[in-house]
Design a protein with these regions (language model features):
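Generic secondary-structure signature for well-ordered alpha-helical cores
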Residues: 172-176
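Periplasmic-binding protein-like
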Residues: 25-43, 131-171, 186-198, 202-204
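Bilobed "Venus flytrap"/periplasmic-binding protein-like clamshell domains
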Residues: 10, 29, 33-106, 182, ...
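Short helices/loops that flank or line small-molecule/ion binding pockets
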Residues: 1-19, 56, 102-123
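Glycine-rich nucleotide phosphate-binding loop and flanking beta-alpha elements
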Residues: 12-14, 52, 126, 161
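Pocket-lining segment of extracytoplasmic ligand-binding domains
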Residues: 68-162
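N-terminal hydrophobic or amphipathic helices and topogenic motifs
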Residues: 1-3, 9-10, 19, 181-219
């Protein structure tokens, strides 16, 4: 669509498909991992009542993922896991479960015992922890990736620069408006910030590094 004014989009597929949309602003999560920046990470989760205490404890078991072109649901976990892969190239997991498409479905697969470990987009997990605490409390985080730029609100190139600037200014003022504090709390954000498009290049760098180490796919 040429008239798309504001949609939440993952930076890695955006970059891979030619970066044809323009960044409006990005959320700044209120969680500690963000440290006041528009970043997020991937958490590796296990069932809360499981015996797993480290990511390495899950090797040989079942790993769930969202989709292969997701940064948080596949690319970032793959890059993290390349550090654990031995020189013999042996598979880390006994079974790969997916694609499950969404973080919630990965979480549900772990809770229901269909998988032993899986990644969570940290921002999505923040939201589920706030709004679905009975579900999110049934898992534990055993490891997290390094934070990278978070998905942003983007607009089509057909939207005028003036409209994009107006939207960006309004979004970036959210953290300074006390009347929006309740909404910000429900969204698990401090506010919004502008984001340099070039910062998303880290996702492609991680992909190349994992592929160079023989981890084109998680296994």
């Amino acid at each position: 669509r040429t008239d798309l004014a504001c949609t939440f989009m993952c930076g890695w597929p955006w970059l891979r498909h030619g970066a044809t949309h323009r960044i409006v602003a990005a959320p700044v999560p209120s969680a500690d991992y963000a440290q006041g920046r528009p970043v997020y990470c991937s958490h590796f989760i296990v069932r809360a009542d499981s015996a797993f205490t480290r990511l390495e404890d899950t090797f040989g078991r079942r790993f769930a993922y969202t989709i292969e072109d997701s940064h948080s649901g596949y690319n970032a976990p793959r890059h993290h896991l390349m550090q654990c892969r031995g020189a013999d190239g042996r598979a880390l997991f006994g079974e790969i479960v997916g694609p499950l498409t969404t973080p919630r479905r990965v979480l549900e697969a772990v809770v229901e015992g269909r998988a032993d470990v899986g990644p969570q987009d940290s921002f999505a997990f923040d939201l589920m922890s706030r709004h679905l605490p009975e579900l999110a409390s049934r898992v534990r985080i055993v490891a997290s990736t390094e934070p990278v730029p978070i998905p942003a609100l983007m607009a089509s190139n057909g939207v005028s620069p003036a409209v994009i600037e107006t939207l960006a200014a309004a979004l970036c003022s959210v953290g300074e408006r006390p009347e929006l504090a309740g909404l910000s709390a429900d969204l698990c954000i401090r506010g919004f910030a502008r984001l340099d498009p070039a910062s998303y290049a880290i996702a492609e760098t991680w992909a190349r590094e994992a592929e160079a180490r023989g981890l084109a796919t998680i296994r």
